[in-house]
Amino acid sequence: ETEELLKFVSLCLGVSPIYRWADPLACHAYNVMKPNGILPWHFDSCEFTLSLMIKKPEKGGIFEYCPFIREPGNENFEEVKKVLDGDRTKVRQLNLEVGDLQIFKGRFTLHRVTKVEGKTPRYLCIPAYVLDPWRVNTPEHSKAIYGKVLPIHIERNEIRSDGLTD
C-alpha cells in the first residue's frame, strides 16, 4: 500500500500515473489455492497485477499465460478461442518460486494457474493497479470471484474505456 511500491510498479512498467485498484474487495487480494484447486483461463479487470509468491505447492500451481493476446478495442476472440480449445502455441509457463515477484498486464494477457498437487496450498499476494482510479469490478465479476456485490459495484458499473469485457 505504500507510495514507494506504487512508484516502483509505475517505473517498472514505464506507465504514469497508475493507481491502486479502488475495488474494496479486490484491492488487497491474496490468493490461496488449496490442493486440487485450479484457476481457469481469464483476464483481469485491472490493467496491472503484481504477484509475489509466498508459499509454493509441492507440485503444480504453474502460472500459464498468453501475453498481449488482446488489446484495447480488440477482444481477439478467435485467438482466445484457440487457447480455450487447447491450442498451446501461444501459451508460456512461469514456475514462480517463493519470493519471486512478477508484474504483468493481466487485462491484456490471458492467464491461468494449473492444478495444485500435493498437500501444500499455494499462497500468492496480488495487489492490483489501474489507469482509471474510479474503476472497480463489475457486479457479475465481483459475485463470481468474491461471492458478493457491494453498492460501489453497482454505482460504478459502466462500459470500460478500453472497450474490453471483464
What is each of the regions a protein language model found here?
Residues 7-103, 107:
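Catalytic core of non-heme Fe(II) oxygenases with the double-stranded beta-helix
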Residues 1-3:
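A short, highly charged nucleic-acid-interacting micro-segment common to nuclease
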Residues 67, 73-166:
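Catalytic core of Fe(II)/2-oxoglutarate
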